[in-house]
Amino acid sequence: MSSHRPQHRLSVPDIQRRKGAGSLVALTAYSTPMARLLDPHADLLLVGDSLGMVLYGMPSTLGVSLEMMVAHTLAVMRGSRRACVVADLPFASYQESPRQAFRNAARLLADSGAQAVKLEGGEEMEETVDFLVRRGIPVLAHIGLMPQQVNAMGGFKAQGRDPESAERVRRDGLAMQRGGAFAVVIEGVGEPLARRLSEELAIPCIGIGASPACDGQVLVSEDLLGLSGEQVPRFVERYARLDREIDEAARRFAEDVRERRFPEARHCFAMRE
């Protein structure tokens, strides 16, 4: 009998237990090849609606559909074995009512195999989060800078940098915890506020443009790989410049084709005798 054991996929309770027990690593993934590469290094793979901007060139995340989220989450599930996979509920798929949120969240999980959904919002979404969690759908909350509210916020602007705004974000975090979210993404807020929330909340706080004191960090993978162009948010660290490597590879290929150096004999199939 083979001694090989299937690799354990991290679960929602596994993520919850990481509060105060080492930093969580979260990365976005939208495809099978990227998920396969990131899976050994990430605790959470987030299939974010950011795919609308990153992959499809949309100006915001508002044009992403539930069908797109199902398809890309399926691709990530096929490429991963270890990480807990969380899929975003896209704009207008959950804000109308808790029942609408349940219907679409249930479809997203059932059709993709993901472990949890992520939704944006604070106090106004507490009832919805509670409704989902009580019916078996784990929720990762998202507070602070919320991309689906880009029009209401007047752009992608940092939040919680004045006392009034900070208190509003703090109340949002507490509301998401009361609603039963297993963790919360805190995006684009003042560092002292993110630090305070990480200390005050009993659930893991995952920062993006927040604070090193958070229980984990998440970045858009294309940003850290250098595939997002020259303009990136100030909180991004580029760990590679794959854009330059891709440009060089494409240049060399084009040159070899035009000079008839590619393909060579070793790339071609011989006739059978």
Swiss-Prot record:
Enzyme class: transferase
Entry cofactors: Mg(2+)
Subcellular location: Cytoplasm
GO cellular component, as recorded: cytoplasm
Manner of cofactor binding, per the entry note: Binds 1 Mg(2+) ion per subunit.
Gene3D superfamilies, A to Z: Phosphoenolpyruvate-binding domains (3.20.20.60)
Record EC number: 2.1.2.11
Residues the entry annotates as binding 3-methyl-2-oxobutanoate: D49, S50, D88, K118
HAMAP family xref list: PanB (MF_00156)
Protein name per its UniProtKB record: 3-methyl-2-oxobutanoate hydroxymethyltransferase 1
Organism: Pseudomonas aeruginosa (strain ATCC 15692 / DSM 22644 / CIP 104116 / JCM 14847 / LMG 12228 / 1C / PRS 101 / PAO1)
Species lineage: Bacteria, Pseudomonadati, Pseudomonadota, Gammaproteobacteria, Pseudomonadales
